[in-house]
Regions:
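Acidic, glycine-rich A-domain
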Residues: 1-223
C-alpha cells in the first residue's frame, strides 16, 4: 500500500525533538470517545513519538488512561497499524496519578531499569480538566489536593529505589487556547498545558518554557 509506505517514511523522518538530551518521556494516552477528532490525533501522535524514543522497559510502550492504568506495548508492523491499535486501547473515566507513578516505578524495579533509562517526563494527554481526571480534588476551590506532600512523598519513594521521579506534564488538548504555567503544586515539578499546535508540540518536548495565547483576532502569539 503506497499510502502506508509514505506514512511510514514520513514517520521515520521526523526529527528528534528531544535533541541531544538523554531526557525522554512516557505518555498516558486518553482514547475515550470524547477525544474523537483532533484531540485523539494529538494524543496518539505524542504517545507514539515518545514511546519510540523511550529506552529500556519503556521502549515502545504507553500507559492507558484509567483509574487502574496499565503499561501497554505498541503493536503493529506499520505506522497505520500502530495508530489504530493505540486508538482502540482501553480507557476509563479518570486516571489515578498516584497509580501511574507507582506503575512506572514498579516497572523500573521489576526490570532492573538503569536510572538513565527512566523516563524524565510523564505526559498525561486528555480533554478533561486536571481536576476531573484526578481521584481527589477540592469541590469548592476546584484546585488539586495532591500538593507538595504527595509530590515529596512520591519523589522520596523514587529516590529510595535509586531513581528520579518523572516531571508531570498534564496536557488538555481540547482547550481553545494555549497556556503553560508552573505555579501549581507549590513549586513542585509539575506543568499544565492547554490547547495544541505544532509550536506547542515542539516546545513541550524540548522543555521550553513559554506561553502561547490566542488574541482577539484569532491569531496566536508566543511569549
Amino acid at each position: 500500500n503506497v499510502t502506508n509506505m509514505i506514512a511510514d517514511a514520513q514517520w521515520k523522518a521526523l526529527p528528534n525533538y528531544f535533541g541531544d538530551s538523554i531526557e525522554t518521556g512516557i505518555c498516558v494516552v486518553d482514547t475515550s470517545g470524547s477525544m474523537w477528532g483532533d484531540p485523539l490525533e494529538v494524543a496518539v501522535s505524542l504517545g507514539l513519538y515518545c514511546a519510540d524514543k523511550c529506552r529500556g522497559p519503556f521502549k515502545n510502550h504507553f500507559i492507558t488512561f484509567s483509574s487502574c492504568p496499565s503499561l501497554q506495548e505498541i503493536r503493529g508492523a506499520t505506522f497505520a497499524e500502530k495508530v489504530n491499535n493505540m486508538s482502540c486501547s482501553g480507557w476509563g473515566m479518570n486516571t489515578d496519578i498516584e497509580a501511574v507513578f507507582d506503575l512506572i516505578l514498579m516497572t523500573a524495579k521489576n526490570s532492573r531499569c538503569k536510572p538513565e533509562d527512566m523516563p524524565k517526563k510523564l505526559y498525561i494527554i486528555s480533554d478533561m480538566q486536571f481536576d476531573e481526571a484526578r481521584t481527589k480534588y477540592d469541590e469548592y476551590s476546584h484546585k488539586p489536593t495532591y500538593k507538595a506532600p504527595f509530590m515529596q512523598q512520591m519523589k522520596q519513594k523514587y529516590k529510595n529505589a535509586g531513581y528520579e521521579m518523572p516531571a508531570l506534564i498534564y496536557w488538555n488538548v481540547r482547550a481553545s487556547h494555549c497556556a503553560m504555567f508552573h505555579d501549581t503544586f507549590e513549586g513542585e515539578d509539575c506543568c499544565f498545558v492547554s490547547g495544541y499546535s505544532p509550536v506547542l508540540f515542539k516546545n513541550i518536548l524540548e522543555g521550553t518554557e513559554y506561553v502561547e495565547v490566542t488574541k482577539t483576532d484569532g491569531t496566536k502569539e508566543v511569549k
